[in-house]
């Protein structure tokens, strides 16, 4: 006798498939258990290995248990459950790669008829045949196992190590697919010699990317640089799975209306003058030293962030370090210095502002918001090049910072006892500045536009985070 376990990211989906499958039964010769969703009312979509283990145990009084899964972390949770189970029970369990709905229905019918486990699996794996025949579709032989072609020899590539606990499962993989969608580039995602096109969740799933795996994105074509930048940034952000990706989800309920004196903070980044240089080597050395100094700053900022707000905020500046510690950026700036015989400040500004523009033109709002991080790094490194101090807002009375936008490094340095709120003409609630402000308990509103034109220095302001509104108190 074969019993079934249905594993899905969604409790509603899992229960719905179970309901359909039970319509196939006329007796109790195939029992079905469900392990779907997670016990978090705010974020119910996901899979839980403990639930899977308990579901298997509930129907383990049989010869075999067949586990049907949707995709991504459902497979990982099922595999983890096998490790947690009593070995005697684990020996009975088989994981099935068939499509969840059609495969479960077919497996239920076969199991209820008394078929052995191998037959049940075979029937489930061929469950799409009827639908394909009805639609006149001839399935390509071995389509799912065919890898993409290896990247062209002239393609550029970026390799990252996956830090997501469950690897590239549905949610992080979907963010990758969305970020790369529509780019005019030939893209190949590779892990240990296996190559797929990163435009399909299913293809990415075929790579079975686990935590600590190294994966490489290769790109050629007009949008190759944009694609690689998006991939590298997403990886630095753990593909949106980091707790910081929730941004201001609860900020409206945790920060009340606040008042303070208006303190203007003009974004300190300005385009440097383009001076000619007579010693190219000297300019390259100046730039290299400024980058080293900035990397040291970012390490210090990460330490400060961890001390004040924990590891999730510290990871922001560790990500900045990764973005800056890229020899391609330095090489690109050196090329500008040599070709244009210009100073390091001008060349560095050109290269990083081009990168900032690439981020701003991405379709993914989460990635778009990262352009200000690039400009934060640029400002800090220009200060080192020019021998200038970093300019930060330091009010001495309860204040509301008023600015066009604000750097994450400025927010992490704010005295949250005195800075009651941040009010931006532009900005984004998905920005790292917003995330840090929320951790600090500082009210944050953005996209205020022309409303800020009527505010004068020393005005007393009232910020309502829930309404995303500012007014004179």
Curated annotation (Swiss-Prot):
Sequence ranges assigned to domain PTS EIIA type-4 in this UniProt record: 1-137
EC number, as in UniProt: 2.7.1.121
Keyword ATP-binding annotated: no
Keyword annotations from UniProtKB, A to Z: Transferase
Catalytic activity line of the entry: dihydroxyacetone + phosphoenolpyruvate = dihydroxyacetone phosphate + pyruvate
Domain HPr: from-to ranges: 155-242
GO molecular function: phosphoenolpyruvate-glycerone phosphotransferase activity
Any one GO CC term of the record: membrane
GO biological process, one term: phosphoenolpyruvate-dependent sugar phosphotransferase system
Enzyme type, top EC level: transferase
Region described as PTS EI-like, N-terminal part: spans on this chain: 266-472
The keyword Lipid metabolism is assigned to this record: no
Catalytic residues as annotated in Swiss-Prot or TrEMBL: 9 (tele-phosphohistidine intermediate), 169 (pros-phosphohistidine intermediate), 432 (tele-phosphohistidine intermediate)
Domain note: Consists of three domains. The N-terminal dimerization domain has the same fold as the IIA domain of the mannose transporter of the bacterial phosphoenolpyruvate:sugar phosphotransferase system (PTS). The middle domain is similar to HPr and the C-terminus is similar to the N-terminal domain of enzyme I (EI) of the PTS. The IIA domain of DhaM (via phospho-His-9), instead of ATP, is the phosphoryl donor to dihydroxyacetone (Dha). The phosphoryl flow likely involves HPr ('His-15') -> DhaM (His-432 -> His-169 -> His-9) -> DhaL-ADP -> Dha.
Family named by the database record: Belongs to the PEP-utilizing enzyme family.
Additional remark text: Unlike the carbohydrate-specific transporters of the PTS, the complex DhaKLM has no transport activity.
Subunit and interaction comment: Homodimer. The dihydroxyacetone kinase complex is composed of a homodimer of DhaM, a homodimer of DhaK and the subunit DhaL.
Record's function text: Component of the dihydroxyacetone kinase complex, which is responsible for the phosphoenolpyruvate (PEP)-dependent phosphorylation of dihydroxyacetone. DhaM serves as the phosphoryl donor. Is phosphorylated by phosphoenolpyruvate in an EI- and HPr-dependent reaction, and a phosphorelay system on histidine residues finally leads to phosphoryl transfer to DhaL and dihydroxyacetone.
Protein name (Swiss-Prot/TrEMBL): PEP-dependent dihydroxyacetone kinase, phosphoryl donor subunit DhaM
